[in-house]
Regions:
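Alpha-helical transmembrane segments of multi-pass membrane proteins predominantly involved
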Residues: 1-228
């Protein structure tokens, strides 16, 4: 879009602004009212799409690496989060495991039942919220900085407010996992294949992108220079 949109920015800017605002609003409000983990993550992805589009709408070269970094950081955390969801199952009374425990209430006390899964999920949620020392923080900072540089200060302010609002449902789940009594019908299952390994890699990668983002940012900058 950076290459194709150059020269017609003013014509497509109103449409992009509308899409950005609508996606952030729908993702934020939808996520807040959810009581299902998978649906919460789905609405979260809508809000994050709005954040990414701020960088896309900036129409300058610095935004390219910011958007690429954001997508990599978000993708890493998303893969890990859905991996955790797949390993938290629901047990019916008097029966065996009946499926994934996607209801938020089923995640109460997960930190006591399986510290690894709960800890990894907390890392991914903190990254989604843009908390420092995670890849999500660096990604949001870079994209929002690119937006300000591109003259999109109003959108960035709205995005910061939306990001603060989305943090509510991320921290809600973290508090449920670590500060509430365990749910009797939620059962963390043993890793199937390399699921636990993948979750661990995603968690470590999410932290590394937040602590030492320089190597990836340098690589993306060189790749951008090569392509342009």
């Amino acid at each position: 879009l950076y290459i194709v949109g150059r020269g017609v920015e003013w014509e497509i800017t109103p449409a992009l602004w509308t899409i950005v605002i609508v996606t952030m609003l729908v993702g934020t409000v939808g996520g807040i009212v959810q009581s299902d983990v998978k649906r919460m993550l789905a609405y979260s992805s809508i809000a994050h799409a709005g954040f990414v589009l701020i960088g896309v709408s900036a129409f300058h070269s610095a935004a390219i690496e910011a958007v690429a970094f954001y997508l990599l950081a978000y993708g890493l955390a998303s893969v890990g989060a859905f991996g955790v969801v797949a390993l938290v199952r629901e047990r019916a009374e008097g029966a065996g495991i009946v499926g994934e425990a996607t209801a938020l209430d089923r995640w109460r006390g997960l930190g006591r039942k399986d510290p690894f899964l709960a800890g990894a999920m907390a890392i991914f949620l903190l990254s989604f919220a843009g908390i420092p020392l995670t890849g999500g923080f660096i990604g949001k900072f870079q994209v929002f900085a690119a937006g300000i540089e591109g003259g999109l200060a109003v959108l960035v302010v709205l995005a910061v407010l939306a990001s603060a609002a989305t943090a509510f449902f991320y921290f809600r789940l973290i508090l449920m996992m670590f500060f509430q009594e365990p749910d009797d019908y939620a059962v963390p299952v043993a890793s199937e294949g390399y699921s636990a390994v993948a979750i661990g890699v995603c968690a470590v990668g999410t932290l590394l992108l937040g602590i030492v983002p320089g190597p990836l940012m340098n690589f993306l900058g060189e790749a951008k220079a090569f392509m342009l």
